[in-house]
Amino acid sequence: DLLDFYPTNSLSWDKLEYGTNAIQNLHYGLIHVGLPTIVDLSKDKLPNVVNGNTPKNYELCQEGDVAFADASEDTNEVAKAVEFYNLNGNKAICGLHTIHGRDNHQRTIVGYKGYAFSSISFHHQIRRIAQGTKIYSINCKNFSECYVGIPSKEEQSKIATLLRLIDERIAVQSRLIGDLKKLRCAIIENVFCSPNHNESALRFKGNTDPLSTYRMEDFCSRITRKNKDNQCSLVLTIAAQYGLVDQESFFNKTVASENLAGYYLIHKGEFAYNRSYSAGYDWGAVKRLEKYPEGVLSTLYICFKIDESAVDSDYLAYYFESTKWHKGLSDIAGEGARNHGLLNVSVNDYFNTRHRFHCMREQKIIASMLNVISQKENDEIALYDNYQKQKQYLLRKMFI
């Protein structure tokens, strides 16, 4: 009763491009990731249709129109909606795997429907009717089975304004977190030193002590401690961007064997090197266990503890976030030293890699400064999460 529906096109990503003056096209992937609930084309970007691929028949979007993603592997993402709040003079159409709806009877104000169709009550209804096994889908006929509450336009305006302001604050918070991450990464890349250089690009004023070259075996020792009698059941994995994390929570499954007695047992503050390489992590990843008191790791990992009289633990954890340790590995592992996703680096060779460090006093200064930035970043992430929880609470309580 609320929406009339219009045909959409099936243009795939190879028929779309950014940065031209051609008609814009909403691909369903952007509904899932990339666009806010309320789309403002004065700041949000849609791709343009590549020349020669404009559909023969189409319906231009109007402000207040909504678009739903008609398919997803996740029932929570089926019928995820966006609303065109401000077209900013642009011509836009709805594309692949979208459902284009319009309130032709003006029962709602511009900016309300996107949130109404994002509400918890609406998506509870969608989950009941979504069809499929691996891929869940809906069509416009399914909406006849769904209901949304429509309050007075005055109340709609208050609801939409509140939620839009929260969304804008979330967007600002996201940019702030991104800027802090960029700052931390830039400092890390400039404050540490490769073993083939004498100095790092960035030094703190008054710190002129020369850097020293060490081999891994000079400041750490290997851990081969086994998980006897399965004393620990927490299986860890290295996620390059998140550190040592619970394997089951991260993957939503465990790939470890039932008997964990043969796994390495590591304690909080100890390190592990994952020789698996992936995009952006050509030489694997080294992470310190920080989230849990202890955990177990496959014997494919190289685990070690450090001599804190030789190197500061926080300093080393940040050092391994940089790319400066890659040179030490590349010196012992040639281009062909990769086998089935693993770097072909022996334990002995790994502990023989060279690294260049500041004196202990400067190590602690560097670690302290980076700890302050990291704590600020974590505080801002916690605030971001609270804004998201607030929005979800309102989406649950303000709509029927």
Question: Could you say what each language-model-derived stretch is?
Answer:
Residues H27, I38, N48-S118, G262-W325, ...:
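A short beta-sheet element
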Residues D1-K15, E145, R203-K228:
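Non-catalytic DNA-recognition/assembly elements of restriction-modification systems
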